[in-house]
Amino acid sequence: MPRIMIKGGVWRNTEDEILKAAVMKYGKNQWSRIASLLHRKSAKQCKARWYEWLDPSIKKTEWSREEEEKLLHLAKLMPTQWRTIAPIIGRTAAQCLEHYEFLLDKTAQRDNEEETTDDPRKLKPGEIDPNPETKPARPDPIDMDEDELEMLSEARARLANTQGKKAKRKAREKQLEEARRLAALQKRRELRAAGIEIQKKRKKKRGVDYNAEIPFEKKPALGFYDTSEENYQALDADFRKLRQQDLDGELRSEKEGRDRKKDKQHLKRKKESDLPSAILQTSGVSEFTKKRSKLVLPAPQISDAELQEVVKVGQASEVARQTAEESGITNSASSTLLSEYNVTNNSIALRTPRTPASQDRILQEAQNLMALTNVDTPLKGGLNTPLHESDFSGVTPQRQVVQTPNTVLSTPFRTPSNGAEGLTPRSGTTPKPVTNATPGRTPLRDKLNINPEDGMADYSDPSYVKQMERESREHLRLGLLGLPAPKNDFEIVLPENAEKELEEREIDDTYIEDAADVDARKQAIRDAERVKEMKRMHKAVQKDLPRPSEVNETILRPLNVEPPLTDLQKSEELIKKEMITMLHYDLLHHPYEPSGNKKGKNVGFATNNSEHITYLEHSPYEKFSKEDLKKAQDALVQEMEVVKQGMSHGELSSEAYNQVWEECYSQVLYLPAQSRYTRANLASKKDRIESLEKRLEINRGHMTTEAKRAAKMEKKMKILLGGYQSRAMGLMKQLNDLWDQIEQAHLELRTFEELKKHEDSAIPRRLECLKEDVQRQQEREKELQQRYADLLMEKETLQAKF
């Protein structure tokens, strides 16, 4: 009988290494292929081994106290839900279950007073581990079995073969087939060029011959078509990338050599930066070294600034006392005021007060879970199972912050008196005998009683308590006597500058305004000034409209002409002169820089500044106030109304305005070569072509900008309305389905109504037929019964005769 091989058992180091290498090659989805490398393990066991032990993300360190508290708390909230508890703690489900049982067994041992140092979950001799996938690997024996050696050699060979023979053979066959096809094609072309036609032998194939026919071809209708879009430029073939080494790809030896070189550089950099760890890594000791855990200390109870303040106070008093001693002042007042506050020598060693005793939360939670597990049925009655105080306030347990008692934060320069252990008693009292007290530090003394506290009083003395009561009653009586006499007539008088005081709050000198607030206020003031200055500028500057780069002063008429100018012409000349002055001022102070131009292009503006300055010196620019500009604007509006009424002008429609604008705009032509405008009838054909090309370029730029803007808006609207659109499509589909169902239901209803009508008319006929059949059957049965009776009688008669 052949031996039956059962897969499973303890994992060995060799199997772990093979499994890790196989996962690196095949991934985490092909467990059957991975298990084929391990003769003693199944695919399910390989997957469990990876996800329970070999995965680098698994935490294998010792359980901290916080993790144990969280484990017991979550086990209480979600019992037996280890797959849910595991990601919250950061461990695997098997680790959580194993440590949970370990804590319960440990608690049971403590309850039974069995003090053993062994792990309660440790397997006894002869037991089989039910979960070998969650345990460390067993070391490999020196002399392996033949099966293990064969498995190891096979796995090494399969994992080392990154480029399999089958893939190489397929690629080679494909390349040969392609070369054969190209050779045959070249041969047919050469024969056809020589005038020899060879009919290609076609093999009868079921289906479509994709080399000779075009599948699903639809020939276009006869006629003429525009083929301008079909012209394209063929790509230049880069024959340098068609070499054999580029087609085969990178060799494995080159890749390994590059990786080794990279590892050497990494090790060299590590030696330069961290020499000890590099030495440990090269010597192989890094696997056994363990870094020390971070020292966790409680938060400090007093800051460095407070310590410096205490030191400064002590140094100041010490300097004053030494000065008084050097000057020879030894009277009682000085000695009382300048008392020595140094800590006296104490032969007893100082000890830090112990922290308050805390309860073992882990032990309490484990005892609670053990008690709940072993509880009897509630049908028996009686008292509930006694449990420790538990916490159900959240998913994770509340942590108790352990703090070292701080003796420095107590009130300085005082001496408590009511039985504080290990402290110097207050003067004038007899210290109480204290037994079994831990001596603490010698406190700071307060001979002047500057810092009295409740702890200073000796409440055990009855006379002291009575004296304090008398003093408090006397103080209260004096306070009540000092109250003013009550008055019932009140008059409310507001101060004269109450509104100003409410509007202008007093600024505290001690308050330091934040620098960000100061900068924001200054920036707001600058912005307001900039807006105010912008409002005082011309409309063309405010709207950033294009402005001429050169001023044409030839539009002015000479004054000494014959015949002399009329008043209207003189007014027009004044307007032109003011316009030229404004242009010079704007070109000097607010030169126009198109947004498309780059820095350094407008060089001509700097050269013309001297001309603008010279002109403004002869014809100074006059600034007007806001009120004057408002009056002038109102006067212009009134004059426009008068002219409109006098000339009988109505409201101009948008169509008429556009027509006039197009006519005026068509008479002006922009010359990009000269960067200026001119009349269209004065421009040459070349200038017209350049102007139209420039306009086409500008329009294309606008079109591109608007297309990008539209695409961005479309994308944004798609994001905003995509859900609504999909929802609307779904609802429309549901509505159509419901409508189809309604139509189908109506059709079925009418069908069944017709069927009912036919059935109602056919039922009486069928009933008559059935009744006739029944009657006919009854008559036939009667006849047969009568015949049967006659035959029976005849049989009896014959039997009686014979």
Swiss-Prot record:
It holds the Pfam family Myb_DNA-bind_6. It is found in: Nucleus; Nucleus speckle; Cytoplasm. Residues 31-54, 82-104 bind DNA. Residues 118-127, 246-262 have a biased composition (Basic and acidic residues). The modification Phosphoserine is found at S303, S358, S417. DNA-binding protein involved in cell cycle control. May act as a transcription activator. Plays a role in pre-mRNA splicing as core component of precatalytic, catalytic and postcatalytic spliceosomal complexes. Component of the PRP19-CDC5L complex that forms an integral part of the spliceosome and is required for activating pre-mRNA splicing. The PRP19-CDC5L complex may also play a role in the response to DNA damage (DDR). As a component of the minor spliceosome, involved in the splicing of U12-type introns in pre-mRNAs. This is Cell division cycle 5-like protein.
